């Protein structure tokens, strides 16, 4: 990527491919799979009926987009973003854009109220409200239903956009919104709605594409519309003034700074993998490795509830009093006293994950049949135990939350791809 960045940074290697209201897209000489996207200082509203040049916006918009895509890629979401190479430019995988704008709404406001009279502003969609709009400037981007998208038979780089593709993009749209919503919540700000777009690679892969910057959403600090930070401030101006543009630039800068925090862990989360014998180390490390994929810190310990009961409970006490959200995964076969003893003497969640053996069908009952008041669970597969721990801890850490959502999406993408191979 470093050589690609060097090539893309030279003007003689760039050829203008397309230009929109707020960005330019360039082909990169010798790099058929990549493009360079350059932000402009243009600020527009009402389909460019209102337009101003705002010095510094290009830098802020490009950095905000980079912040957002780097965060989403940290979560494991496939996107077209590759690398930021200057203050106003980034390199992306080349895609043919699907001419549909996907809008996700958590709160009813703006144009939604005009299209749906009777709905009060502030109505909350617990299940995100999704809308789609066909990108057609001449007709003010008309709203399309799923049926209209299917009926129009959109063919994007040999990929026909049908019900399965629409369903997949809906899932991706919801994931993007929910992940960014968690990021914004770190600064006590509410993500109200947002718009995104998708593209198709030459391999036929659907990717989150285009840009996601402060023109892409509504954000209300403290859930108060009067404090809004997004482009709506510009739209709401009866008359554009220098003071008004200065406020817009200030808000955009604040958004850039806040989105830079999205990729940072705000709350540590821990998984203690405790095994009854050192011979279970390989199995326990599988759990640890899987847990780390979700952004969880892990510790491996050997301790026997039968032979070193007090030592086991001392280890648990250390984690219980640390203040760090922790899940215990107990790895013990034969007569599993480890998980039940910990669960019966601690408030920490405990998951039994007994290693397989020839006598598993008999030994498993020591992990399943519990006296009253224990409250531990049992999972047989190490990767599933790690996933269960991640789900328990997801409410404490936005990155763990996002990685869990992305893992679920990848399962859905795998099923989608398997069906495509059958066609």
Curated annotation (Swiss-Prot):
Residues 1-263 are annotated as: SAICAR synthetase. Its EC number is 6.3.2.6, 4.1.1.21. Keywords: ATP-binding, Decarboxylase, Ligase, Lyase, Multifunctional enzyme, Nucleotide-binding, Purine biosynthesis. The keyword ATP-binding applies. Residues 264-423 are annotated as: AIR carboxylase. The keyword ATP-binding applies. GO terms for molecular function: ATP binding; identical protein binding; phosphoribosylaminoimidazole carboxylase activity; phosphoribosylaminoimidazolesuccinocarboxamide synthase activity. It catalyses: 5-amino-1-(5-phospho-D-ribosyl)imidazole-4-carboxylate + L-aspartate + ATP = (2S)-2-[5-amino-1-(5-phospho-beta-D-ribosyl)imidazole-4-carboxamido]succinate + ADP + phosphate + 2 H(+); 5-amino-1-(5-phospho-D-ribosyl)imidazole-4-carboxylate + H(+) = 5-amino-1-(5-phospho-beta-D-ribosyl)imidazole + CO2. Pathway: Purine metabolism; IMP biosynthesis via de novo pathway; 5-amino-1-(5-phospho-D-ribosyl)imidazole-4-carboxamide from 5-amino-1-(5-phospho-D-ribosyl)imidazole-4-carboxylate: step 1/2; Purine metabolism; IMP biosynthesis via de novo pathway; 5-amino-1-(5-phospho-D-ribosyl)imidazole-4-carboxylate from 5-amino-1-(5-phospho-D-ribosyl)imidazole (carboxylase route): step 1/1. One of its GO terms (biological process) is 'de novo' IMP biosynthetic process. It holds the Pfam family AIRC. PANTHER family: MULTIFUNCTIONAL PROTEIN ADE2, SI:DKEY-6E2.2. In the N-terminal section; belongs to the SAICAR synthetase family. This is Probable multifunctional protein ADE2. It comes from Caenorhabditis elegans.
């Amino acid at each position: 990527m470093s050589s690609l960045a060097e090539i893309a940074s030279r003007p003689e290697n760039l050829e203008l491919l397309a230009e929109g209201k707020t960005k330019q897209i360039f082909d990169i000489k010798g790099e058929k799979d990549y493009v360079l996207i350059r932000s402009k200082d243009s600020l527009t509203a009402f389909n460019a009926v209102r337009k101003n040049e705002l010095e510094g916006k290009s830098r802020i918009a490009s950095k905000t987009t980079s912040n957002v895509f780097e965060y989403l890629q940290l979560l494991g979401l496939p996107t077209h973003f590759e690398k930021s190479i200057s203050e106003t430019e980034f390199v992306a995988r080349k895609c043919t854009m699907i001419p549909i704008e996907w809008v996700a709404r958590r709160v009813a406001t703006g144009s939604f109220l005009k299209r749906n009279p009777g709905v009060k502003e502030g109505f909350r969609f617990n299940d995100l409200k999704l809308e789609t709009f066909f990108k057609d400037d001449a007709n003010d981007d008309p709203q399309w239903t799923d049926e209209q998208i299917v009926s129009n038979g959109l063919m994007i780089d040999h990929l026909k956009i049908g019900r399965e593709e629409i369903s997949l993009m809906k899932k991706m749209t919801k994931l993007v919104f929910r992940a960014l919503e968690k990021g914004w919540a770190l600064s006590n700000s509410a993500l109200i709605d947002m718009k995104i777009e998708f593209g198709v690679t030459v391999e036929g892969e659907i990717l989150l594409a285009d840009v996601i910057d402060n023109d892409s959403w509504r954000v209300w600090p403290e859930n108060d519309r009067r404090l809004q930070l997004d482009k709506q401030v510009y739209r709401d101006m009866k008359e554009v003034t220098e003071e008004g543009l200065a406020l817009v630039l200030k808000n955009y800068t604040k958004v850039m700074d806040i989105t830079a925090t999205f990729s940072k862990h705000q709350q540590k989360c821990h998984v203690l993998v405790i095994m009854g014998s050192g011979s279970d180390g390989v199995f326990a490390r599988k759990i640890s490795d899987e847990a780390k994929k979700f952004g969880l810190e892990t510790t491996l310990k050997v301790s026997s509830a039968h032979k070193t009961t007090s030592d086991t409970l001392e280890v648990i006490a250390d984690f219980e009093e640390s203040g760090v959200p922790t899940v215990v995964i107990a790895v013990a076969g034969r007569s599993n006293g480890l998980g039940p003893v910990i669960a019966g003497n601690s408030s920490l969640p405990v998951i039994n994950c007994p290693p397989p053996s020839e006598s598993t069908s008999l030994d498993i009952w020591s992990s399943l049949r519990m006296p009253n008041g224990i409250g531990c669970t049992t999972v047989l597969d190490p990767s599933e135990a790690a996933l269960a721990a991640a789900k328990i801890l997801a409410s404490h850490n936005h990155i763990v939350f996002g990685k869990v959502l992305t893992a679920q999406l990848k399962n859905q993408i795998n099923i989608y791809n398997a069906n495509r191979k059958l066609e």
